[in-house]
Structure formats: structure tokens, C-alpha cells
């Protein structure tokens, strides 16, 4: 009888899979295969694209390149697969038996089997922060054995240090590319240097002479700094047990059996049975907390003596890796770490800022915003801060989050609440995630999220990493992603579905109140309270806490029916989240439909002014003069005013915010938007890696502040409830801008300076138009703010 068989799937349920044997090399004679392991946004993929072009353009060799990477915005795993040879290459698959392997990320030697398949006599290049002796000491045993037994040529280079010294930050790509050409000797090295520098001029010429010269220096340094390591003879006697991932037994079974293998690039080896009970695609929350990627070069160190306990560092952290904790005297003493006495409302507790170094991406936004006279945070090498990981684990597990202050009272108080959005795969210094994190702290335990496809969905729900998590009661955000174009409608449907369930609860209560003889008068009174309060999150939560035990004690049929739906007693906080490509462009029709519905949902548009997820294409949010894909000569049409359009309904709460400019305004807007009994729209300014910010993403918060102070962005909110009180519903929250700073602001971002280099005459015209447009918009807001009511 005919049976379907599968190859590449371990089917231990229907037993129809065929086993796959050992890897064999099918490359044609003379074909050179190379494999490069990199980190998302470190430039490895781009460098290898240039390398294959150089080889193809300067020799008669056939060339092929494949690139593989995960969906993290940056800081994720990447691999580059290069082949070149004298015969046509007909290998439509990734490199599995390379002649050359380069590991650009030092920590990968402990995470992945980077030497797997490397041919005997091949070459291995490692970016190591240590000298040769220390590198040899720290290599895993299986690597030592493999290097020795297969007579591998082993090279190291401290590209991390060189990049830092040259001002390239974490971009080691050019240095490692130069080292590859020095070792591989595919073409004469001096010719490779010449071609690399030509490619640099072409790639970075528009970004300025300084960038070009830094990369020139990186090329020279990469060739000079390569060190060949002599492999000790005794390594050959080490038993090669292969790469073994040691799992933490305390991790949940789902993490150990599914998440860790996928993170370790072993996901294809998972058997079908591992997914039993998860056929619908449901995924556990909070799995990002188990990644512990350790990708930062430098992470913050807390200077306890300088800290003024403002908690601003925690508020702006894009990945929720730095948090304030409160402890009793006994808890602090038992922890074995240093605490200081709390201030103000927390004066009866010990206070500590704790960092999770292995989750940090090293953006240093926390250092940037620290207002202390002497910074309470300084960046230090990751290795020096690894002991802090034990402190983090201990404090989270044994001390936790104390609800001793009202989190809705101030920004400082809010930071003592657990973020229910943590350790996402967003870029270091991401301008979007602090907004989502703040919402999760305010409303996370009752939060439902419909997420548009884009950056926000990629870092929020890419298997196996889920940053949305739960509190100690198992409460947390419910998250789902439909499509790019229908997210607003999808979120509205979530809200309508929940309210239908709550209608059933109300019907049961009304029937119980009218005719149940088992329900006490007191219980019926509380049911009446719930019916009156069902539209309020806070009040419905307070009433539900009293109602549930009373219904459990009653046990009548009405109460049983209601208890089956008790998860819906507390009003949910429905959020619809996406970027400007969604909110301004592709999903705008849906956004308008949802706002017009008048229903109680909240929309957050994180505005990067480009399609960030797909590489920086122009959107209707892109301002005049900005260079983006599809607007390479500068955008010619002014930015769409999404907030002004929404205000025309008159019954929509609308606000424009920037966390870098006013932390308190954002805090107040989020509370008001959630409390407003109708649709709300919050538009948040989000500096992005696509902007090419001078100084890098370490300046995210400062950029948000400068954007408002110069008039590039404006803070305001429109609350229809104020009109009901006889007040002007439109409130301008930012001061009059200093327009003299406007041009300086533009010149701090490559998306504007590149236009000046390419089209200087047009640039002057467009920059002037951009300033005039910003003034026009500000003046229109001022007219609204001055209207009499």
C-alpha cells in the first residue's frame, strides 16, 4: 500500500519519516566553501555580500552566497554561506561542510556548534576579546578536541576592541572581512584591500568622510591584527563528546524541550511529538526570559552612592533589563548584595537598582537619561558584570515586586511594578519598546493586544521568543497578530467578542437578581454594583474581588454560569498596536473604521516615520526632506497629520507623545487614554536605527527631547471629556520651540545629511520647507489651544 513519507522531519507520531544520514560534501572539485556566524546589525551579512562581489568582480570564479538569519530586529543570530570556484556552482542549499569558518561573536562558542562540518585542514577565525593563551583556556573541550584532531588552522583577532577604538561601536564587519581575505588568500591581499576600500566609498560615501575613514582604518587593522594560534598537541587526546547544551533543570518543560533546542539552532531536530497539544499554534508567554543572549559588549554598572532613586533608567530601558527593587531589612540582609535606604514613600524599605547583564543589549540609554550630578550608571565590559546575573536571579525569585506604592501616581512609582513586556528582540536603543513596556506596567494584568505586522510584531512574537509575560498570579497580556492591513479591525473584533461574553455575565446577574432565591440580598447588591461598574477597569476589578468568593459560596446555577466566565469579570484593556506604515498607510482605513465605531479601544502608533521592519521605506509619516527608500532624493510632500484627522470626530481621545521629551506627559496620556470611555489614539515619536542618528542609538531619549525642543515634534492631547466640562479639549503640552535649533536637529541624522551631500541645492530648499511645515503645524495647534469654550 502506498504511504507518504517525509524527509527532514522526525515523525514519531505517524512514523512516516525517513532518517537523514551524515552530512556529505557534494561540492565540485576546487569549490571553496565558507561559513560566517554573526550578530544581527553587526554588519556581517553586508560585509559578506561585498566579499562575494569582490571575488566575483576580480577573478574568473563562479560565486554564490546565501544568508540566514532570525527575525530579531538586531542582536539575533546570522549566518552567511559563501561558495566560489572554477566550475559552475549548482548547490541550492546552505553550506554544511565548510573549508573556512569565522565566528564574529565570542559568546557563540558556548551557544552553538560553530565547528560542525568544518573540513580537516580547514581554517577557523574567532573574534576573541582575549589573547591567545586566555582564548585557549576558555574554549570548550569539544572545540579543542575538534581543532586538534582535524588539524584546523586556528586564528584569532580582537575585532571588538578594534571596532571600539576606531569609533565603530559593535560593527566588527569590516575588520573581520579584512581578516578573512588575509587568511583565505583567495585573491592577493593588497588587491582585496583596494577593492574593500572601493566598496566602502560606495556604501558609506554619502554618510560622511569620517565614516569612510573609520572603515578604511578597519580594513587595515583587520589584516594586521590576525594572530595564528598554535594548537597544543595535548588537545588531540581530549575526548570529543561533541557540542552539548546544558539545560537548567529549573526551567519549565516547554522551555527545555522546545524553546532551548530552537534557540540552539536544533529546532529542525525536534520530533513531532514535542508539539502534542499545541497543534493550534498556542505558545507559552515569557519565553524571552530564558534566552540570556549575552550579546552586549558593555553593560551598565550601578553606582549606589550616586543614585538619587528617580527610576528614570528603568522607565526608558527598551528591554526592561534594569529595574528598581524594594526589600525589607531581612530580605536585604539575606540577599548578600548592597542596598540603600529608600526615599519618600519607600523610606521604610531598602532600595536597589538591579541589572540583568545577559539580557542587556548595551544601548546605554539608561546612562544617557541618568540625571544624577555624577552618573549612577557607567558602562562596563560584560564579563565584569556577570556576577550581577546571579543577583538578578536571586532578587526576582526571592524578593520580587512589592505593591507598596500607587503605581498610577508617578513615573517613579510605576517602575516598581513588574514589566509584563521584557527582553524583546528589538534593536539596542529601540525607540518603540519603552512605550509598550510602560503600557504593560500600567495595564498588563488585564491587557489584550492586537499587533499589526511590522517591527512591533516581530519583536513581540517570533517563535520561540515571546517577551509578553505574566505576574505571580498568572495574569498578563494576551497577544495575537493577524495581518498588516486588518489589525485595527482584528483588535476591534477582540473587544466586541469580550464584551459579548460580559453581556452574558450581565444577563445572568440580572436573572439572578430578579428570580434567584439562593442568592442573598448582599450578593445581589454586589451584582448590581458590578453591572454599574462593568465599564471601569479599576471599579470592576474591585467589585469582582468581592463578588467571586460570594458566588462560590452561593453555588446556585446562575453563580456557576458566571464563575465559568469569571476571567471576563474585570474590564479588559484592549490595545491595538502598530507602526506608522500601518497606522498612516496600509491600515489607515481600518484605523479610521475603529475610531468611527465609538467603541472603547486604545490604539498606539509608534511613529518612526518610515517602514522600519522592511528596511526604511517612505511612509505618509515621512517628513519633507527626509531620505528614505522610494524617496532617495528627499520626500517632497509634507507629513500626514494623523492626530488632526482623528480629532475631527470630536469623540476620540487623541495624543501625541515623546518619552524622551516628557516622561510625565506620556504617563498621564496613557492613563487618560485607557480611562476614556471611547476610542483613543496615541501617536508616539520613536527614534529608529533607520534614521542614522549621529552618536547612535545610545541617544534615543535625547533625540526625542531635541525633536520637541526644536519644533520637529509636538506634544499635545485632545480629551473630549474636557469639552463636557466647558473647557478646551485641546491642550498643548510642549513649550514654544526654539526654531533656531531645527536645522541643527536635522543635521544630526543621516536621513537628512545624506540629501545635503547628494543634492545640496535641493536639500536647502527641502530643509527650509520642512521647517516651514513644522511651523505651520505648530501654529495650527496653537490656534486650537487658544479657542474659547
Give the residues covered by each predicted segment.
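Conserved small/polar residues in nucleotide/adenosyl-binding loops
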Residues: 1-2
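Flexible loop/turn segments at secondary-structure boundaries
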Residues: 13-14, 42-46, 72-74, 109-111, ...
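Thiamine diphosphate
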Residues: 18-26, 32-120, 312, 432-448, ...
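Active-site cofactor/cluster-binding pocket
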Residues: 28-40, 44-260, 331-336, 617, ...
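A structural-propensity feature for long, helix-poor, extended segments
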Residues: 67-105, 209, 219-220, 465-515, ...
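Glycine-rich ThDP/TPP pyrophosphate-binding loop and its adjacent helix/strand module
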Residues: 114, 556, 570-576, 585-602, ...
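Short internal beta-strands
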Residues: 123-129, 452, 603-607
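Ferredoxin-type iron-sulfur electron-transfer modules and their immediate structural context
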Residues: 192-196, 205-360, 367-575, 626, ...
Amino acid at each position: 500500500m502506498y504511504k507518504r513519507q517525509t524527509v527532514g522531519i522526525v515523525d514519531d507520531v505517524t512514523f512516516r519519516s525517513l532518517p537523514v544520514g551524515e552530512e556529505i560534501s557534494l561540492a565540485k572539485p576546487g569549490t571553496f566553501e565558507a561559513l560566517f556566524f554573526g550578530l544581527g546589525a553587526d554588519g556581517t551579512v553586508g560585509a559578506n555580500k561585498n566579499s562575494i562581489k569582490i571575488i566575483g568582480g576580480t577573478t574568473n570564479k563562479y560565486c554564490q552566497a546565501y544568508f540566514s538569519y532570525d527575525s530579531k530586529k538586531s542582536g539575533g543570530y546570522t549566518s552567511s554561506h559563501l561558495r566560489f570556484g572554477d566550475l559552475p556552482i549548482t548547490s541550492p542549499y546552505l553550506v554544511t561542510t565548510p573549508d573556512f569558518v569565522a565566528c564574529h561573536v565570542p559568546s557563540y562558542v558556548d551557544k552553538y556548534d560553530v565547528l560542525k562540518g568544518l573540513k580537516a585542514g580547514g581554517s577557523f577565525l574567532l573574534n576573541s576579546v582575549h589573547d591567545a593563551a586566555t582564548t585557549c583556556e576558555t574554549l570548550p573541550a569539544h572545540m579543542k578536541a575538534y581543532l586538534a584532531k582535524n588539524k584546523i588552522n586556528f586564528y584569532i583577532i580582537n575585532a571588538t576592541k578594534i571596532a571600539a577604538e576606531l569609533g565603530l561601536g559593535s560593527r566588527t564587519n569590516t575588520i573581520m572581512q579584512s581578516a578573512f581575505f588575509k587568511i583565505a588568500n583567495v585573491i592577493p591581499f593588497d588587491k582585496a584591500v583596494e577593492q574593500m576600500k572601493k566598496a566602502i566609498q560606495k556604501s558609506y560615501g554619502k554618510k560622511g568622510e569620517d565614516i569612510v575613514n573609520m572603515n578604511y582604518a578597519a580594513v587595515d587593522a583587520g589584516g594586521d591584527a590576525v594572530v595564528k594560534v598554535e594548537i597544543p598537541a595535548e588537545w588531540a587526546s581530549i575526548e570529543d563528546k561533541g557540542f552539548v547544551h546544558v539545560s537548567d533543570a529549573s526551567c519549565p518543560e516547554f522551555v527545555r524541550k522546545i524553546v532551548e533546542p530552537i534557540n540552539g539552532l536544533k529546532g529542525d531536530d525536534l520530533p513531532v511529538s514535542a508539539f502534542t497539544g499545541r497543534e493550534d499554534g498556542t505558545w507559552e508567554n515569557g519565553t524571552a526570559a530564558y534566552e540570556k543572549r549575552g550579546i552586549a559588549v558593555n553593560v551598565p554598572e550601578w553606582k549606589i552612592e550616586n543614585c538619587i532613586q528617580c527610576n528614570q533608567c528603568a522607565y526608558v530601558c527598551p528591554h526592561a533589563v534594569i529595574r528598581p527593587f524594594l526589600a525589607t531589612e531581612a530580605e536585604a540582609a539575606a540577599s548578600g548584595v548592597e542596598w540603600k535606604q529608600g526615599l519618600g514613600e519607600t523610606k521604610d524599605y531598602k532600595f536597589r537598582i538591579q541589572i540583568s547583564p545577559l539580557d542587556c543589549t548595551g544601548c546605554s540609554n539608561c546612562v544617557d537619561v541618568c540625571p544624577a550630578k555624577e552618573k549612577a550608571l557607567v558602562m562596563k565590559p560584560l564579563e565584569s558584570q556577570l556576577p550581577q546575573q546571579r543577583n538578578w536571579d536571586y532578587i526576582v525569585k526571592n524578593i520580587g515586586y512589592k505593591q507598596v506604592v500607587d503605581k498610577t501616581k508617578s513615573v517613579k512609582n510605576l517602575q516598581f511594578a513588574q514589566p509584563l513586556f521584557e527582553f524583546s528582540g528589538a534593536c539596542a536603543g529601540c525607540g518603540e519598546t519603552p512605550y509598550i513596556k510602560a503600557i504593560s506596567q500600567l495595564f498588563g494584568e488585564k491587557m489584550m493586544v492586537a499587533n499589526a505586522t511590522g517591527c512591533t510584531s516581530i519583536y513581540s512574537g517570533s517563535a520561540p521568543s515571546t517577551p509578553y509575560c505574566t505576574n505571580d498570579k498568572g495574569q498578563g497580556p494576551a497577544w495575537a497578530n493577524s495581518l498588516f492591513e486588518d489589525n485595527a479591525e482584528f483588535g476591534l473584533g477582540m473587544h466586541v467578542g469580550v464584551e459579548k461574553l460580559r453581556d452574558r455575565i450581565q444577563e445572568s446577574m440580572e436573572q439572578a437578581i430578579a428570580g434567584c432565591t439562593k442568592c442573598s440580598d448582599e450578593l445581589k447588591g454586589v451584582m448590581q454594583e458590578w453591572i454599574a461598574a462593568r465599564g471601569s477597569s479599576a471599579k470592576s476589578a474591585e467589585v469582582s474581588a468581592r463578588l467571586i468568593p460570594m458566588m462560590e459560596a452561593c453555588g446556585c446555577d446562575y453563580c456557576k454560569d458566571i464563575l465559568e466566565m469569571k476571567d471576563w469579570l474585570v474590564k479588559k484593556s484592549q490595545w491595538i498596536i502598530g507602526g506608522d506604515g500601518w497606522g498612516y498607510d496600509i491600515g489607515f482605513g481600518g484605523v479610521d473604521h475603529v475610531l468611527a465605531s465609538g467603541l472603547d479601544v486604545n490604539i498606539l502608533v509608534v511613529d518612526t516615520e518610515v517602514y522600519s521592519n522592511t528596511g526604511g521605506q517612505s511612509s505618509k509619516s515621512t517628513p519633507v526632506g527626509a531620505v528614505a527608500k522610494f524617496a532617495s532624493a528627499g520626500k517632497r510632500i509634507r507629513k500626514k497629520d494623523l492626530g488632526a484627522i482623528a480629532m475631527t470626530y470630536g469623540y476620540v481621545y487623541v495624543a501625541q507623545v515623546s518619552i524622551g521629551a516628557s516622561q510625565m506627559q506620556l504617563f498621564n496620556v496613557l492613563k487618560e487614554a485607557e480611562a476614556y470611555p471611547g476610542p483613543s489614539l496615541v501617536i508616539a515619536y520613536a527614534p529608529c536605527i533607520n534614521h542614522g542618528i549621529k552618536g547612535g542609538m545610545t541617544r534615543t531619549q535625547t533625540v526625542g527631547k531635541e525633536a520637541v525642543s526644536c519644533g520637529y515634534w509636538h506634544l499635545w492631547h485632545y480629551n473630549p471629556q474636557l469639552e463636557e466640562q466647558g473647557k478646551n479639549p485641546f491642550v498643548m503640552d510642549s513649550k514654544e520651540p526654539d526654531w533656531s535649533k531645527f536645522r541643527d536637529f536635522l543635521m544630526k541624522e543621516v536621513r537628512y545629511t545624506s540629501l545635503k551631500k547628494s543634492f545640496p541645492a535641493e536639500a536647502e530648499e527641502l530643509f527650509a520647507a520642512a521647517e516651514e511645515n513644522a511651523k505651520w503645524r505648530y501654529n495650527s495647534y496653537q490656534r486650537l489651544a487658544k479657542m474659547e469654550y
